[in-house]
Design a protein with these regions (language model features):
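N-terminal periplasmic accessory domains that precede
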Residues: 86-89, 108-113, 126, 150, ...
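Extracytoplasmic beta-strand/coil segments of soluble accessory domains associated
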Residues: 55, 87-130, 146
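Short acidic/polar hinge/loop motifs at secondary-structure boundaries
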Residues: 128-154, 171
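Gram-negative outer-membrane beta-barrel transporters
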Residues: 355, 359-364, 375, 427, ...
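Transmembrane beta-barrel wall of Gram-negative outer-membrane proteins
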Residues: 181, 188-220, 224, 228-267, ...
């Protein structure tokens, strides 16, 4: 069977399974994630805001009680807003943005100004407890997701490496033990967009074994037109799948296996000169039209034993991804330079953890109790890249020349030991202290050479180790049952490493460290109908790692330590159940992040400059309304997101002005059937959220991609 025939058969099998798999009924059963459940009259008339449980500190806790800034996007919000990617949910979290292009592999989260290279993220995405050590595998289609947690501020004391800016925790819905359920949805939109999404879930052995399966095929035409050929450049097409099994072999024991996969075959990057894009949006001109492909397979195994005074848990993760992108590297009409870049990565992670049970804290006295957790984390990662730059005749020689820049192999192994203890005094005052020790060993083989050999090849073999201790202390005071005041001080850590490609002598970079001071308040008002949370923070960076361009090689970037920086800001989140069926919400963030004294990037002094891709403010406001009409439900939602101005590079030579996006969605649900209409970027705002320095070849000095234009469509679906 050919490669293409295999994937066609896989897609057909997935859709047939979703539609025709037997689904025996067992009374009233929950609707699986991905379907929009018709709310009952009790749901709509309920005034109190729901309690949301998060695992921002590994153990389940009420979002309003945990002394951490966290925004939880629940399954209900994911469905109501039509969220299909983590980056789409980020507008609901203050001071959180994604630096990403339409290519799936380029997507990096930034929180409070902290963010860096996809190869060494400062804000790590956890998919069902498994950290994505390279951001390449983190931007995936959301299937059967129960919630997304945006945790802001350093979490290194518990999560270790690459969490000094925060973390994003994506949690899948559990397979249903109660009865079989399923859903199928068919959205379609302009730009030739169409999607088939579906899922089933239910028990195989009563109270012992349940399974779940979901899949999606998502495709659209490109937004950007190549004026040379008239073709659209940046088309997208991907098939995603998730399978789960939940096994309860005995009381207090459970095991869960989650397998995910993605097969993406996309068009080219929509990159073009920024000045030209602003004059003529969604148009480019190049002689070669390329492609960007990605494949991901991930397996997660979770085992948990509860009951008694201790809780034991194990999370094992294996993630394998490959990418290949072919593009016109000069991004001009001239046949000068093309790039064929292949990357692959295999990671293994294992965490073992023990914690005191919530119902069995250790009594220190009549008014003092202790809760604790401790664990060990192991990982191994192997990354390989072979990027071939093909020069046309008379560019570097009178004949065609290929340059492998780089051909590299990076291996990384590490261990982390962590613990946290929380003492509760008189049921109202918590004092917590935690710390984590991390050690990593890194090896690199870095090669650059030409075919034919017009210059001597270079090869670097290097190894280096990094160790760090990351402490954190916090205090929380519960004022009555509805309000919590808290303060935290913590250190963040991101290991150093090796660049797959860089100028000679810049192959290695050092670790980055931060100290974070934060104070906040979490409150409930009007009998639980209103929640209002606020935080202020101050961050000090040392040896900040920044992704900077290689002046000698187009589109090649490397990580460099550029000096220090500070970030100061405030955040406010308010949600209110204003009337039966009516929810109002807002999230506001302000950040001032600047480079410190003595900071330099190459030959350029950047002291006092703004940290790139850090808007000075983010604002999100919205409303959601549901109403019963007979036995059916009508619903509508509006989201308005505004981003402040930000810079594209550390030299602050070009940036994006403030812009506003408006998203609308509404629908009608009757018994098993659902119909919706939607508009994203309703006012067709033109903006360039992603741009990179490109001296010599781009007239403005920058290549950029337009943000998505106005898209609109409809969706029909069925639940069974």
């Amino acid at each position: 069977m050919s490669h293409r025939a295999f994937w066609f058969a896989a897609r057909l099998t997935a859709v047939v399974a979703v539609v025709f798999l037997p689904t025996p009924s067992s009374g009233q059963t929950p609707v699986p994630a991905g379907a929009i459940a018709a709310p009952t009259e009790d749901d709509i008339l309920r005034f109190k805001m729901p309690t949301v449980t998060v695992t921002a500190q590994k153990e389940p806790e009420d979002r309003q009680k945990v002394p951490v800034s966290v925004t939880a996007v629940t399954r209900e919000t994911i469905d109501a807003a039509g969220i299909r990617l983590v980056s789409e949910a980020a507008i609901l979290s203050p001071n959180t943005i994604f630096t990403e292009s339409t290519a799936r592999k380029l997507s990096s989260a930034r929180v409070r100004g902290i963010g860096s290279s996809p190869n060494n993220p400062a804000v790590t995405t956890y998919l069902d407890g498994v950290p994505q050590l390279n951001a390449n595998s983190s931007s995936v289609e959301l299937l059967d997701v129960d919630r997304i947690e945006f945790v802001r501020g350093p979490q290194s004391a518990l999560f270790g490496r690459n969490a000094l800016g925060g973390l994003i925790n994506v949690v899948s819905s559990r397979p249903s033990m109660a009865g079989w359920t399923g859903s199928l949805a068919l959205p379609f939109a302009n730009y030739g967009a169409w999607t088939v999404r579906g899922g089933v879930s239910g028990p195989v052995l009563k109270d012992r074994l349940a399974i779940g399966f979901s899949a999606a095929q998502v495709s659209r035409d490109g937004f950007t037109i190549n004026d040379v050929t008239g073709h659209d450049l940046d088309s997208r097409s991907a098939f995603s799948v998730k399978g789960q099994a939940l096994w309860v072999p005995a009381a207090n024991w459970e095991a869960r296996v989650i397998v995910t996969g993605e097969h993406a075959r996309d068009g080219d990057y929509g990159l073009h000169d920024v000045a030209a894009l602003r004059a003529n949006p969604f148009h480019a001109a190049r002689d070669f039209e390329g492609s960007t492909d990605r494949g991901i397979v991930g397996t997660t195994i979770q085992v948990r034993r509860s009951g008694g005074p201790l809780v034991f848990s194990s999370t094992t993760g294996i993630v394998k991804w490959t990418t290949r992108d072919r593009t016109d590297l000069d991004y001009t009409l001239q046949p000068l330079l093309q790039r064929d870049n292949a990357e692959e990565d295999l990671q293994f992670t294992q965490e073992l953890r023990v914690a005191s049970a919530e119902q069995a804290p250790i009594a220190l006295s009549d008014s003092a109790h202790l809760r604790w957790q401790a664990g060990v984390f192991l990982f191994s990662q192997g990354y390989q890249q072979d990027a071939v730059n093909s020069f046309s005749p008379f560019v570097v020689a009178p004949f065609p020349v290929s340059q492998h820049s780089p051909r590299s192999a990076l291996d990384d192994d590490g261990v982390g030991l962590f613990g946290q203890a929380t003492v509760t005094l008189a049921t109202r005052f918590d004092v917590s202290a935690g710390a984590r020790f991390d050690h990593e060993s890194k090896d690199a083989t870095l090669e650059t050479f030409y075919e034919p050999q017009i210059a001597p090849p270079s090869r670097v073999d290097a190894e280096k180790g990094f160790s760090s201790v990351s402490p954190q202390v916090s205090a929380a005071w519960r004022v009555g049952s509805a309000h919590t005041l808290y303060g935290t001080v913590g250190r963040g850590f991101k290991a150093g490493g090796f660049n797959a490609a860089s100028p000679a002598g810049r192959e290695a970079y050092d670790e980055e460290q931060t100290w974070n001071i934060e104070g906040g308040v979490k409150t409930e008002w009007a009998g639980g109908r209103v929640t209002a949370n606020a935080a202020v923070f101050h961050i000090d960076w040392d040896d900040l790692q920044l992704n900077v361009p290689d002046p000698a090689v187009p589109a090649q970037f490397f990580i460099a330590n550029v000096g220090g920086a500070t970030s100061n800001g405030v955040e406010l989140e308010i949600a209110a159940r204003a009337a039966p069926g009516l929810d109002l919400f807002t999230a506001i963030g302000y950040t001032k992040a600047r480079f410190g004294a003595g900071s330099v990037s190459g030959p350029i002094g950047i002291e006092g400059n703004l940290v790139p891709f850090t808007p000075d403010y983010t604002v999100s406001v919205g409303a959601q309304y549901s109403r019963l009409v007979g036995t059916a439900t009508v619903h509508g939602r509006v989201d308005v997101a505004r981003s402040g101005a930000f810079q594209y590079d550390e030299a602050n030579s070009l940036g994006q002005d403030a812009y506003t996006l408006v998203h609308l969605r509404g629908g009608y649900t009757a018994r098993r059937w659902l119909a919706e209409v939607f508009v994203r970027n309703a006012f067709d705002t033109a903006y360039i959220p992603f741009a990179l320095p490109y001296p010599n070849l781009a007239p403005s000095g920058f290549l950029g991609e337009m943000g998505a234009p106005r898209t609109f469509g409809a969706s029909v679906g069925v639940r069974f």
